[in-house]
Every structure is written in structure tokens, then in C-alpha cells.
């Protein structure tokens, strides 16, 4: 079981308020408003090109809105707040030649975890997702579905205050989807707001 004692922060909520993002003549996001409440899992549905990824990038600070704002528990979000977000981007950013466990430990240490804590937590998630036997393998040697699970695992490490996951279930088999959903439900039970995107409406339901 993942150690829940790490979850020491007061639960936060996130609000997207009148967000607009234009790329020259194309308006990708137009006056968007929604809440990601503390302790809730929010599904973000839409076809490719609907603005899901653009919106997530604005929340985590990768893109600057044309106008509008992101609120963190009722106040404008800061760079320090954003450092506590567990983010899984649309573009998978794993280092293909690095062993899985080394990569996860490195990413967790960037977020402030100690080496021992990072290694313990990473191995617990790998075991839970059926990947413990692959911990020393290079990422590039894993199937795409297993790489997806590693990418999600990276976002879960180091006690994130908020989870923003872009297509986390893409390419996963039903068993892996259930395992991933169970972990996300546990996070929401701890008060963590979770936003995930999907083009599969059955997953949103």
C-alpha cells in the first residue's frame, strides 16, 4: 500500500476562469470556466483539437493564457503552487535509454523527495501496476502500454497536491485501466483534485 502519511497538505481546489487561448487567427480555448474540486475526479472529454491539452498546459503554466486566469483555492495560482502539481503531458517525456527505477527516482527528486523515499514509493507503484520485474529495464524496451503506466507513475510521485493527466488511459488494457482508476480514486479520497482528459466517453462516465 502506498504510504498515505506523505499527504500532509490542506486539500486545494482549482478553478479555470474565463480562459482564452488564441494562436494567431485560431481560438483554441474560448471563455472556458470549470472547477476541479478538492477530492473529486473530473473528466475532461472532447475530440482531438477540442482544446483539452491547451487548457491543461495553461493550468500547469506551460502556456500563458491570452486572457483569463487559473485560481488555486480562490486566489491566483503561483509558480510555487504549480511545482506541487503532478502532470502527465500529452507528449510522453520519458528517457528511452534510462532504467525505469532510476528515471522515476530522478523525477521524484526534482519534486523534492529524498532518494530513499522516491525509490520506495516508485517501487510500490511499480508493484501495484505489475511492473516491479521491469524496474531495471530501459524504458524503450517496454511495451507502449507499460511506458504509459510508467508515465502515470511519474506524475503520482512526491505527494502531488493536484493531478493533471492528459489521456492517462490511452493504450491501456482493461485491467490496467482499472488499476489506474483505483489509484486515482485513492488520491481523491485523500483530498487531491484530479483532472484527466479522454476522448473515450465511457471512461468519463
Regions found by a protein language model. Name each.
Residues 105, 109, 117-134:
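Conserved ABC ATPase "signature" region
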Residues 163-166:
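Catalytic Walker B motif of ABC-type/P-loop ATPase nucleotide-binding domains
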Residues 60:
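Helix-to-loop junction immediately C-terminal to a conserved catalytic motif
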Residues 68-81:
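Conserved ABC transporter NBD signature motif
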Amino acid at each position: 500500500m502506498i504510504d498515505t502519511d506523505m499527504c500532509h497538505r490542506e486539500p486545494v481546489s482549482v478553478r479555470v476562469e474565463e480562459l482564452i487561448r488564441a494562436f494567431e487567427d485560431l481560438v483554441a480555448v474560448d471563455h472556458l470556466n470549470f472547477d476541479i474540486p478538492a477530492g473529486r475526479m473530473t473528466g475532461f472529454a472532447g475530440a482531438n483539437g477540442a482544446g483539452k491539452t491547451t487548457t491543461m498546459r495553461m493550468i500547469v503554466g506551460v502556456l500563458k493564457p491570452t486572457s483569463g486566469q487559473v485560481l488555486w483555492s480562490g486566489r491566483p495560482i503561483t509558480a510555487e503552487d504549480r511545482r506541487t502539481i503532478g502532470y502527465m503531458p500529452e507528449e510522453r517525456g520519458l528517457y528511452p535509454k534510462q532504467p525505469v527505477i532510476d528515471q522515476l527516482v530522478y523525477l521524484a527528486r526534482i519534486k523534492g523527495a529524498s532518494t530513499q523515499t522516491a525509490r520506495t514509493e516508485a517501487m510500490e507503484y511499480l508493484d501495484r501496476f505489475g511492473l516491479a520485474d521491469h524496474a531495471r529495464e530501459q524504458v524503450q524496451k517496454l511495451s507502449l502500454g507499460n511506458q504509459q503506466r510508467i508515465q502515470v507513475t511519474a506524475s503520482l510521485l512526491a505527494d502531488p497536491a493536484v493531478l493533471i493527466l492528459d489521456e492517462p488511459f490511452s493504450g491501456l488494457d482493461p485491467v490496467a485501466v482499472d488499476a489506474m482508476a483505483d489509484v486515482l480514486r485513492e488520491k481523491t479520497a485523500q483530498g487531491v483534485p484530479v483532472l484527466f482528459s479522454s476522448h473515450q466517453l465511457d471512461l468519463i462516465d
